Amino acid sequence: MAVRWELLRRDPASAARLGRLHTPRGVIETPVFMPVGTQATVKTLNPEEVWDLGARIILSNTYHLYLRPGHDLVQEAGGLHRFMNWKGAVLTDSGGFQVFSLADLRKITEEGVQFRSHIDGSTHFLSPEKAIAVENALGADIIMAFDECTPWPCDYDYAKRSIERTARWAARCKAAHARPDEQALFGIVQGSTFADLRRQSAEEIVALDFPGYGIGGLSVGEPKELMHEMLEVQVPLLPDDRPRYLMGVGSPEDLVEGVWRGVDMFDCVLPTRIARHGTVFVPDGKMTVRNAEFARDFLPIQEGCDCYACRNFSRAYIRHLLKADEMLGLRLCSIHNLRFLVRLMEEIRAALAAGTFAEYRKAFLERWHAGEAERRERARAAGGAGHAPGPAEPLLPENR
């Protein structure tokens, strides 16, 4: 088996688990957050910087790499690891989320999805077999089955047809997988926000016996309470001895709540996306350092943080860089945000090892939500936007 997950300890107060993911490129402690390198690069950072942050596994995007530079070229270069000079593990998604986000540019059939490239408008067809062939060529350690990701809100009948198609596609992905001894193929469970469909999808996908399972179709606009409810329905139905991966989720509070409900792996572009607008994570919420209040603030982004940005620069300096459109400002905010999430997972793992995760979760969420509420109140009083990350970006090219 290309990847094996090892259970180390169960949390006595929740569904959380402490574990290890054994991969061809080393052991990864779980729960883990995976930085996203959509185009075979984590935006604004080089691989050594990502490694130094403590990341040991990153995600790359099949859809984007298929369109540019092409999976054949990546394979010719020796695979993703050599192409991007990354010594850790890599997970590739199947491209399903991106293709299904192209609502006006794609057509779904039982065979697969025809879509037009967001780059040049060229027409392409992605089937389960094609997606797996692309992922086999890219050479990641963990690859994801091709699934249909439904939007929110979603009609019940459509969601039901979708999970049944996803199950059929998952079986085709498994049959097409040409490198099972080198790459672990994870199945993906869906079901929108319908509890019975979440149960049905889990039953159908688990029956195919994958070495790990992605949980898809959440964090697509639904209220957080609904996401938590769906996790509580679906996660217990996934095999206890396999890793569980909540796809596209990466806000600090969602990581804590996901771990509480038994999730082992997470990914999201959020830390680098908001960094490009000067928004950073701190223990009491999100803070936008490009705001005028930080013009003469000579403290680090977060006192006590061990990241390169906080060890060397002040909020005032980083604000200056952002206002001057200097790339270093974006890099420093990205470094801090990624280190914040990697360290958060380190703290969660330490709390799980000590049997104190319930106390850690309570303290973290109380401080986080209190800080967020205070910033919203200050923003309302000032008639401003608070810590809003800036103008909305299109879903592509960077998506989740």
Curated annotation (Swiss-Prot):
Pfam families: TGT
Cofactor: binding details: Binds 1 zinc ion per subunit.
Biased composition (Low complexity): 388-400
Name of the top EC class for this enzyme: transferase
Residue positions of the active site: D93, D267
GO BP field: queuosine biosynthetic process; tRNA wobble guanine modification; tRNA-guanine transglycosylation
Essential cofactor(s): Zn(2+)
Coiled-coil ranges (or none): none
Binding of substrate, residues: D93, S94, G95, G96, F97, D147, Q190, G217
EC number: 2.4.2.29
Gene Ontology molecular function, alphabetical: metal ion binding; tRNA-guanosine(34) queuine transglycosylase activity
Annotated stretches, region: RNA binding: 248-254, 272-276
Region Disordered, residue ranges: 375-400
Role description: Catalyzes the base-exchange of a guanine (G) residue with the queuine precursor 7-aminomethyl-7-deazaguanine (PreQ1) at position 34 (anticodon wobble position) in tRNAs with GU(N) anticodons (tRNA-Asp, -Asn, -His and -Tyr). Catalysis occurs through a double-displacement mechanism. The nucleophile active site attacks the C1' of nucleotide 34 to detach the guanine base from the RNA, forming a covalent enzyme-RNA intermediate. The proton acceptor active site deprotonates the incoming PreQ1, allowing a nucleophilic attack on the C1' of the ribose to form the product.
Subunit structure: Homodimer. Within each dimer, one monomer is responsible for RNA recognition and catalysis, while the other monomer binds to the replacement base PreQ1.
Protein name (Swiss-Prot/TrEMBL): Queuine tRNA-ribosyltransferase
Gene encoding the protein: tgt
